[in-house]
Curated annotation (Swiss-Prot):
SUPFAM superfamilies tied to this protein: P-loop containing nucleoside triphosphate hydrolases
Stored PANTHER family: ATP-DEPENDENT RNA HELICASE DBPA (PTHR47959:SF1), ATP-DEPENDENT RNA HELICASE RHLE-RELATED (PTHR47959)
Native source species: Homo sapiens
Connected disease: Orofaciodigital syndrome 5: A form of orofaciodigital syndrome, a group of heterogeneous disorders characterized by malformations of the oral cavity, face and digits, and associated phenotypic abnormalities that lead to the delineation of various subtypes. OFD5 patients show the core features of cleft palate, lobulated tongue, and polydactyly. Additional features include frontal bossing and intellectual disability.
Catalytic activities: ATP + H2O = ADP + phosphate + H(+)
Protein name: Probable ATP-dependent RNA helicase DDX59
Length: 619
């Protein structure tokens, strides 16, 4: 049998309290045609249906309207008459009667329809009794093939390959390295660490002594060698230390916190035991996908996605299925907490991803309200591409004896990105963009173009397709969640040559296929600039970022010069000769000089005393 996600029972006065009435659904002609090719033993489905009926006749949990589990027991005819409701549907027998899944909803592992139920034997999502029977047959056949191909391994392998607990210990290879070798390694890789008694970085994932299943999943997902941030952050996280981490965009921060999350949740009995907070739906969906890839094959490891823009009832019900890891946006999770539909007292590790974006989007108080429901001894990890002063202040509030890990220079663009700054007046921007898209050396589809408004994104996308003939599409916050998900999928699969976007794609998303970014409109801050050009250069890949500037960005001229020029990029003469740049430079130098004068040193001590005496005498 399996556990239904949202099962409803009809009770009439004449019923015995145990019967189910099916909702009649007319199948689509396509479904009927597809079903002719299906070959499922009818007796398997019938047996499963009988089992479900027996299960329903006993005490069985169902979700109440408020999202809480309610016990359903046999009731008397009198009570049944009181509680009778309009006709409601039972467990679906055939997949053709099940609807297709909406974005973010669980998907049947057999046919891809809405995974309304969870198979109790495998914890996989299925849509009907038919697909459950198919799924169990597939599992059985796979097990038999595995035994035939390697009988000795099948006999020797224990049912549960995991130990009762996990404690990270430094690998003998790492222990045998000299201290100067470790320091040289950190220096060569650009790893800066601050904190007390910080463990050494790993050089290979196998140095963590992770379960074999997890090591296999890492390789399958393309993680061959850890990146610098992963080398230091993973062992520190596995030891349970609080962390404030900053690294270049695309440096592998997600996997760096997912491994400690998985290992912590794997050996915890309480559910949920891990929480990951992200500022946007798209980032949450991406993190859950990566988490599922790494968790595949690990026992009792389930995730739930709690984000706005997707139906709430399936999320509430999924919460009741003993999920280990919650991946959520602050607003949706706080709403669920206020409904008392989730308990976070068992959470042992919390990750706040893209923490600086959280603050800029006004989520700081929501994050703090959520963390008030977390135990005080919970491990906390703050992750971001940049660490402004506001993040430093938040870290001082949330973290206890933290380890600060920084790879690359704070708040600087990724070194793998070739940056080109062009002076382009507003009327000439479209023409310049079309020139870039027609340049064989620069044009490497798909190209991501950033603009500063939604209407501008739509109009520019239409112009690109009309003038250049390239397949172009726009994406922004006014597009529906389904549209945005399909556009993202199309971008990753190469369906679009140009995507024109507002800042919705500027943070956190791994767009591995993108090699060229054009900032059609200069972002409003250098932090946003860092994130937007960071859509290229992901995970060590090289890329190019072209930015159009003019006097509309005059307040950022000195910041652009300071941060971009050291990378070797040639800046346009209009920028270097701008009076705005020189004025900003002069003001900053005066500010620095004033700061130095305010510092009391042996050299200026007497001057400060004389100045103080003079000001007092004038009074």
């Amino acid at each position: 049998m399996f556990v239904p996600r949202s099962l409803k029972i009809k009770r009439n006065a004449n019923d015995d309290g145990k019967s189910c009435v099916a909702k009649i659904i007319k199948p689509d002609p396509e479904d009927l045609q597809l079903d002719k090719s299906r070959d499922v033993p009818v007796d398997a489905v019938a047996t499963e249906a009988a089992t479900i009926d027996r299960h329903i006749s006993e005490s069985c949990p169902f979700p109440s309207p408020g999202g809480q589990l309610a016990e359903v027991h046999s009731v008397s005819p009198e009570q049944g008459a009181k509680d009778s409701h309009p006709s409601e549907e039972p467990v679906k027998s055939f997949s053709k009667t099940q609807r297709w899944a909406e974005p973010g909803e669980p998907i049947c592992v057999v046919c891809g329809r809405y995974g309304e139920y969870i198979c109790d034997k495998t914890d996989e999502d299925v849509c009907s009794l038919e697909c459950k029977a198919k799924h169990l047959l597939q599992v059985k056949e796979k097990e038999e093939k595995s035994k035939l191909s390697n009988p000795q391994k099948a006999d020797s392998e224990p049912e549960s390959p995991l130990n009762a607990s996990y404690v990270y210990k430094e690998h003998p290879f790492i222990l045998n390295l000299q201290e100067d070798q470790i320091e040289n390694l950190k220096q060569q890789l650009g790893i800066l660490v601050q904190g007390q008694e910080v463990t050494r970085p790993i050089i290979d994932f196998e140095h963590c002594s992770l379960p074999e299943v997890l090591n296999h999943n890492l390789k399958k997902s393309g993680y061959e060698v850890p990146t610098p941030i992963q080398m230091q952050m993973i062992p520190v996280g596995l030891l349970g230390r609080d962390i404030l981490a900053s690294a270049d965009t695309g440096s592998g921060k997600t996997a760096a916190f997912l491994l400690p999350v998985i290992m912590r949740a794997l050996f915890e009995s309480k559910t949920p035991s891990a929480l990951i907070l992200t500022p946007t739906r798209e980032l949450a969906i991406q993190i859950e996908r990566q988490a599922k890839e790494l968790m595949s094959g690990l026992p009792r490891m389930k995730t739930v996605l709690l984000v706005g823009g997707l139906p709430l009832p399936p999320q509430l019900y999924r919460l009741q299925q003993h999920v280990k890891v919650i991946i959520a946006t602050p607003g949706r999770l706080l709403d669920i907490i206020k409904q008392s539909s989730v308990e976070l007292c068992g959470v042992k590790i919390v990750v706040v991803d893209e923490a600086d974006t959280m603050l800029k989007m006004g989520f700081q108080q929501q994050v703090l309200d959520i963390l008030e429901n977390i135990p005080n001894d919970c491990q906390t990890i703050l992750v971001s591409a940049t660490i402004p002063t506001s993040i430093e202040q938040l870290a001082s509030q949330l973290l206890h004896n933290p380890v600060r890990i920084i790879t690359g220079e704070k708040n600087l663009p990724c070194a793998n990105v070739r940056q080109i700054i062009l002076w382009v007046e507003d009327p000439a921007k479209k023409k310049k963009l079309f020139e870039i898209l027609n340049d064989k050396k620069l044009f490497k589809p798909p190209v991501l173009v950033f603009v500063d408004c939604k209407l501008g994104a739509d109009l520019l996308s239409e112009a690109v397709q009309k003038i250049t003939g390239l397949k172009s599409i726009s994406i922004h916050s006014e597009k529906s969640q389904i549209e945005r998900k399909n556009i993202l999928k199309g971008l990753l699969e190469g369906d679009y040559e140009v995507v024109v976007s507002t800042g919705v794609l500027g943070r956190g998303l791994d767009l591995i296929s993108v090699r060229l970014v054009v900032n059609f409109d200069m972002p409003s801050s250098m932090d946003e600039y860092v994130h937007q050009i960071g859509r290229v250069g992901r995970l060590g890949q090289n890329g190019t970022a072209i930015t159009f500037i003019n006097n509309n960005s005059k307040r950022l001229f000195w910041d652009i010069a300071k941060r971009v020029k050291p990378t070797g990029s040639i800046l346009p003469p209009q920028l270097l000769n701008s009076p705005y740049l020189h004025d900003q430079k002069r003001k900053e130098q005066q500010k620095d000089k004033q700061t130095q004068n305010d510092l009391v040193t042996g050299a200026n001590l007497m001057d400060i005393i004389r100045k103080h005496d003079k000001s007092n005498s004038q009074k």
